[in-house]
A protein has these predicted regions:
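Conserved phosphate/anionic-ligand binding catalytic regions in large, soluble enzymes, centered on
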Residues: 75-78, 144-153, 240-265, 444-450, ...
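N-terminal glycine-rich flavin-associated loop
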Residues: 13, 37-69, 87-133, 149-201, ...
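C-terminal substrate-binding/cap subdomain adjacent to the FAD-binding core in PCMH-type
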Residues: 144-146, 153-157, 164-393, 426, ...
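Cysteine-centered iron-sulfur cluster-binding motifs in ferredoxin-type domains/subunits
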Residues: 556-577, 612-634, 894-895, 922-923
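N-terminal flexible segment immediately upstream of the FAD-binding catalytic core
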Residues: 1-60, 64, 74-105, 134, ...
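Iron-sulfur cluster-binding electron-transfer modules in prokaryotic oxidoreductases
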Residues: 521, 551, 637-745, 751-950
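Non-heme iron-sulfur electron-transfer modules
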Residues: 532, 539-543, 576-612, 633-660
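Flexible inter-domain linker/hinge segments
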Residues: 190-234, 511-572, 577-597, 693, ...
Length: 950
């Protein structure tokens, strides 16, 4: 139960925000109370905001009732800055608007747009989003800016602080200010004179303290996000510029960022990389220091543009070992102690090829004094250097994937001044070893002196917590006392480094930060406990539990226990923002498993299981697209299938029905055809509008599958058999009076075989064996007919498996959780295809990519293809393509994406049309077998973006 102040707050906001965007239930409060870090707080209220006006109203009410507020975008933060035990306001989906200046050098963004999406928007203009954190494919602009997250290339010259031009913010009292709008500035100065004057006073006081001003400049000469950002006070005179830049790195402790205008960066078209290997870590660091100084002679260019080396990523020997780097493995065989081997992944970029070649020559000359294990070799071929970067990207999942059950994967984040790098790196390596973190590795942005070190840490005992506390105290001493570096370089202060802000910065700087906080948030209601925290042990409290979900080790779903809750999966989860995301499903199942195992709170367990059914189970498409962006390759759909299996145990009515369908599949399919015919008849009689209205009402009241105008007519493969027979062989004309069943069809195709023709085994999917075309379809023939015709035009003889109408890949049962039946059907199909292909002699074609994807997972001994891949691979040179001038929109299915065939279908479409359009921000369609009929709202949400584009 919420307290009286929360109750009053709730009563008021329900008049401002729809109920479906206000969460007070146990399930969703827990789900949204998780970010990528290793802390957990459960909010009292979660509100999904849609507009600046809503934020203003919410902050006014929170101010009135004295209730703390935390803002959250993607929840990929690592230091505990996006969690709350009070009010959590989410600003993600629906905060995705943007605009680009005519010269493409500026972009205005709302906080909910993903960083990679910004890059996609800017790519046609040769520009890019300046900050480049490793989470750019998942993190949203609001979080990137408010954490001053940087990355491999942007360093300190192109981070959010350096490219920010103006900001639109909502202050703690609900006031809206646009620092880039003259009218807004004038209004704010008139209504908030004390605020305006206090900014000026702080600016002047900091500048008057020459020692403090010099320290600020020195501290920000390297990456630093510890505490609030004080650099604006020494960079800018204009109070509004100072206000805007104070937002960068403020982690939601000062105001809400509703919009930001930033300078875009030039995206160099020519790039080259080299993986340099040194036999000791100090030499590797010395080489980085030398490369940092390299500049070209273009005096008209900016200092950053003149820098020849754009990136240098250091990977210590444990990093190389974790990804089984082949050079490391070779070196390990040659020496007794391979612990010195260190790689530096180096990148240079240029505007022209000539400039790129010159850059490479300069770097190679610079490296001559250094001894490398293998010769220096740069490559400008993407297919080659992408392998280097894949090694770099693979470190985190490789180390995280080896963690023991119940431990969490921590990524610490420090920075040193470049001149200290050789000694500091060796010291850090020794410090970690001294504390017994034998599996920890050091890697990161060496060119900026910024390292990450990964720890697989348990917090289950007091000794575990003490070990981590001792480590962090020693890290604090090393980084601050010995090298005057940054305890947090790009991951945010959060709760993790809040106790050490004053220690790193000193009294004067910390007092200045406190003065800024007091000015912006006098009641301390904005993200309390973050950056400023009076508890010296807040960094070792409120740890997130990671209990095991009991799953058979042989099951692919067992991978969910490797989940570190980073949230990278959510960009591909279609229900994220609708019900629950893939990450949230794992979070909730962990808590449900914990409650089951402990038996401590049966009422809460019952409540969570009940509340989970619709958002967690029924609206999970189960397609596994989430695995494509997961660093551990976790398919949360596998977990959903296990949950569904538990609800349909053997002997249950549902399981028996599924088993009956599997055993009588041909008959069940035949019985569906009259149903489709009846629906088509009703459509013809009633018309589309009346039919839609009636069936929608029946769906809402009775729960029957929803009819749509696109519902196809019934179809039977053998209705086309006679045309196939005539087209393939005169010998088949004698079969024109035979019964049209699939057994006959197989016999007919066998008659036509000859030893010289190319052959293919064609298995039409269950859907295409049963369903034809919808009413008023612009297409004349069903897919099976078209497919056979196309194969014959390409000179292929078509072979069908025996008893085709009884066969299925098993997807139907897998999606329902009847996994053993699904595997049984897959085995039946494999046997039939093995026979039809003459033991794998001929390729096998299936016309439905989801079916083909499952076939590839369960059938290993045959070459299996879906239509686009088969046509592009085998028929492209045998057919004459005539391009249409009509634009063609292509939807790339989940299964095609997972099989790596997205480019294939687009390339094939370009052979057929002069203009091919792939709608942006469309992943899974949400139909998911029959989910589009039973839960059409999921399908509707998934396809909310393509209609305006098309």
């Amino acid at each position: 139960m919420v307290k009286s102040s929360y109750t009053s707050f709730l009563q008021e906001i329900r008049g401002l925000i729809p109920q479906d965007r206000i969460y007070t239930d146990e399930l969703r409060r827990l789900a949204w109370g998780t970010d990528a870090g290793f802390y957990r707080l459960i909010p009292q209220i979660v509100i999904r905001s849609n507009s600046e006006e809503e934020i203003s109203d919410l902050l006014r009410l929170a101010d009135r009732y004295g209730l703390p507020v935390t803002f959250r975008a993607a929840g990929t933060s690592l230091s505990g800055q996006a969690i709350s035990d009070s009010i959590l306001i989410v600003a993600g989906k629906h905060w995705e608007k943007y605009s680009i200046s005519p010269d493409h050098e500026q972009i205005t963004l709302q906080p909910g747009i993903i960083g990679q999406r910004v890059n996609e928007i800017l790519a046609p203009y040769g520009r890019k989003f300046a900050p480049d954190p490793a989470s750019v494919k998942s993190a949203m602009v609001g979080g990137i800016v408010m954490n001053n997250a940087s990355g491999m290339n942007c360093g300190t010259h192109a981070n959010s602080d350096k490219v920010l031009l103006s900001a639109r913010i909502v202050l703690a009292d609900g006031t809206m200010l646009d620092t880039g709008d003259d009218i807004s500035r004038a209004s704010f100065e008139a209504t908030h004179p004390d605020f305006y004057n206090r900014i000026c006073e702080l600016r002047d006081q900091i500048r008057a303290n020459e020692e403090l001003a010099a320290r600020i400049r020195y501290k920000y000469s390297i990456k630093n996000v510890t505490g609030l950002n004080l650099l604006p006070f020494v960079r800018f005179d204009d109070p509004f510029d100072i206000i805007a830049h104070l937002m960068v790195g403020s982690e939601g402790t000062l105001a809400f960022l509703s919009q930001i205008t930033m300078r875009t960066e030039y995206d160099y078209p020519h790039k080259a990389s080299a993986m340099l290997y040194f036999t000791n870590i100090k030499d590797a660091c010395r080489a980085v220091v030398a490369m940092k100084e390299l500049s070209n002679d273009n005096t008209s260019a900016s200092e950053a543009d003149r820098k020849i080396v754009k990136g240098a990523e250091l990977l210590d020997y444990k990093s190389l070992s974790s990804v089984e780097d082949p050079v490391y493995l070779k070196y390990k065989q040659e020496v007794a102690d391979a612990s010195g081997l260190t790689a530096v992944l180096t990148e240079t970029k240029a505007r022209t090829r000539e400039e790129l070649e010159q850059n490479i020559s300069v770097i190679e000359e610079c490296l001559k004094p250094f001894s490398t294990y293998i010769p220096v070799h740069f490559t400008d071929r993407p297919e080659e250097y992408s392998k280097y970067w894949a090694i770099r990207s693979g470190i985190f999942p490789s180390v995280g994937g080896t963690r023991q059950p119940g431990t969490t994967c921590l990524i610490e984040d420090v920075a040193f001044h470049i001149e200290d790098l050789p000694e500091a790196t060796a010291d850090l390596q020794q410090l970690i070893a001294r504390h017994g973190y034998d599996d920890a590795c050091i890697y990161g942005h060496a060119l900026e002196g910024n390292y990450h070190f990964i720890l697989n840490q348990s917090f289950s005992t007091d000794a575990d917590v003490k070990r981590y506390e001792d480590l962090m105290n020693d890290v604090k001493t090393l980084v601050v006392d010995k090298y005057d570096g940054s305890l947090k370089a790009e991951h945010g202060t959060g709760r993790n480094m809040a106790p050490f802000v004053k220690y790193e910065w000193g009294e004067a700087a910390f007092e200045a930060m406190k003065a800024v906080k007091q000015l912006f948030d006098p009641k301390g209601l904005l993200n309390p406990g973050v950056i400023f925290n009076d508890d010296p042990q807040c960094h070792i409290k409120n740890f997130k539990p990671l209990p095991l979900i009991p799953i058979d080790e042989a099951s692919p779903a067992e991978k969910v226990n490797k989940c570190i809750e980073c949230g990278f999966c959510e960009v591909n989860c279609l229900s994220c923002g609708f019900t629950l995301s893939s990450r949230q499903r794992i979070v909730l199942q962990r808590e449900i498993s914990r409650l089951k195992q402990s038996g401590t709170d049966p009422e809460r367990l019952f409540l969570l299981e009940k509340q989970y059914r619709y958002p967690g189970n029924q609206t999970c498409a189960g397609d596994g697209l989430c695995s494509m962006s997961c660093p551990m390759n976790i398919n949360t759909g596998d977990l959903t299938h296990i949950i569904r299996q538990e609800t349909l145990p053997k002997g249950s009515l549902g399981y028996k029905a599924g088993d009956f369908v599997a055993n009588h599949f041909a008959g069940v399919k035949s019985s569906l055809r009259p149903v489709l015919s009846l629906a088509n008849f009703g459509h013809s009689v009633l018309g589309t509008k009346a039919m839609s209205s009636i069936t929608k009402g029946m769906h809402n009241v009775l729960g029957i599958p929803l009819w749509t105008p696109a519902m196809p007519k019934s179809y039977k493969v053998t209705s086309y058999k006679l045309q196939v027979a005539t087209a393939t062989s005169n010998e088949l004309q004698a079969t024109s009076t035979m019964q049209n069943d699939s057994a006959t069809l197989v016999a007919c195709s066998s008659v036509a075989r000859n030893s010289t023709a190319d052959k293919v085994v064609y298995f039409p999917s269950c859907i295409n064996q049963t369903m034809g075309l919808p009413k008023k379809s612009p297409v004349e023939q069903p897919l099976v007919n078209k497919m056979i015709s196309l194969l014959q035009k390409g000179g292929y003889e078509v072979i069908f498996p025996k008893d085709m109408d009884k066969l299925c890949c098993g997807t139907i049962w897998e999606s329902k959780g009847m996994l053993d039946i699904a595997d049984r059907k897959a085995a039946e199909l494999e046997a039939a295809l093995w026979e039809a292909s003459e033991q794998g002699k001929y390729p096998v074609l299936c016309d439905q990519s989801p079916c083909l994807h499952r076939m590839r997972e369960t059938i290993q001994k045959m070459k299996l293809y879906e239509p686009a891949e088969f046509i592009y691979t085998f028929l492209r040179d045998k057919l004459v393509f005539t391009q249409t001038d009509r634009p063609v929109a292509v939807h790339i299915t989940c299964s095609m994406r997972k099989m790596g065939l997205a480019d294939t279908i687009v390339s094939l479409a370009k052979l057929c049309a002069t203009h091919v359009f792939v709608p942006e921000e469309v992943g899974c369609c949400g139909f998911a077998g029959d989910r589009g009929f039973t839960y059409p709202e999921l399908n509707s949400y998934a396809l909310r973006t393509p209609r305006p584009q098309i």
